[in-house]
């Protein structure tokens, strides 16, 4: 896709990209390179991944990161119950074959006779699912900054060349024509390692300007120019506030959609639950909405 095609197709999904976003997506696709997207909460990092999956017609796998994730949740796992059932099934035959062997020889014989680590017992987790030859996918690694450094290290091989080395099984490498689209998001909760950053191209999504918010509302809702301008003014004010839960672009779109249905002064003032997700923010958000109510309410 060209830069203009990326811009137009993202807009068709309702995602309004800046030039920075379009060029970052173009570079990611041209080089088959993971894209690390940073920005404040609510600026549209996750929405970009969803919109791009829709544009490209790819299934999206989402890996929500948090401290404590292990490789059997991120990369792969084994079906231990099936392994035990396999052992039980061949046990009578094995007992007969190893009855005259020493312990070391018996272990070697069992290990060579029963495939405990074959494809039949391997459970692919999100990362492995994107390179196992089952079709091209988009992988969203969401909030990578909340994962531990050990989890970061776990992903290096995958992000480098879309392959995973699995002990006792071998190396799984992605077919050339199925290389995944990989987007990592970060809220800068902690500094990512240099090794992680070197494996990715980079995009920082800025907070949206008033004009950009108005454009989003025009594409995503049917509110008129006056209401869109008033809502955009509110959003710009929200972005400058130190809220416990910053208001996201998707939340402001939901609020505008509500106002389409009930734009009365009372309706606007009683719909703040669409914006406020922490009771400590209610007073500040409510005061801001009151300042712009004459531009928003019908």
Where do the language-model regions lie?
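C-terminal regulatory/interaction module of P-loop NTP-utilizing enzymes
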Residues: 1-298
């Amino acid at each position: 896709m060209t830069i203009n095609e990326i811009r137009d197709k993202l807009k068709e999904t309702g995602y309004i990209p800046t030039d920075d976003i379009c060029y970052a997506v173009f570079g990611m696709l041209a080089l088959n390179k993971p894209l690390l997207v940073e920005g404040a909460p609510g600026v549209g990092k996750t929405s970009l991944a969803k919109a791009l999956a829709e544009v490209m017609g790819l299934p999206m796998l989402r890996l929500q990161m948090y401290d404590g994730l292990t490789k059997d949740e991120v990369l792969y796992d084994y079906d231990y119950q099936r392994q035990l059932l396999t052992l039980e099934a061949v046990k009578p035959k094995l007992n007969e074959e190893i009855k005259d062997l020493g312990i070391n020889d018996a272990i070697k014989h069992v290990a060579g006779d029963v495939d405990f680590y074959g494809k039949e017992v391997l459970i692919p987790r999100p990362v492995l699912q994107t390179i196992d030859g089952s079709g091209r996918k988009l992988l969203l690694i969401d909030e990578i900054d909340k994962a531990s450094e050990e989890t970061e290290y776990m992903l290096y091989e995958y992000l480098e060349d879309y392959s995973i080395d699995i002990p006792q099984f071998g190396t799984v490498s992605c077919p050339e024509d199925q290389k995944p689209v990989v987007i990592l998001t970060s809220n800068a909760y902690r500094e990512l390692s240099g090794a992680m950053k070197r494996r990715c191209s980079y995009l920082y999504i800025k907070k949206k300007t008033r004009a950009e918010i108005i454009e989003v509302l025009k594409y995503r809702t049917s509110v008129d120019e006056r209401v869109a301008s008033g809502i955009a003014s509110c959003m710009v004010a929200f972005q400058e506030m130190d809220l416990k839960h910053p208001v996201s672009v998707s939340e402001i779109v939901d609020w505008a959609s509500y106002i389409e249905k009930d734009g009365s002064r009372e309706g606007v003032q009683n719909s703040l639950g669409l914006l406020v997700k922490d009771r400590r923010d209610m007073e500040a958000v409510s005061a801001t909405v009151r300042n712009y109510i004459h531009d928003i309410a019908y």
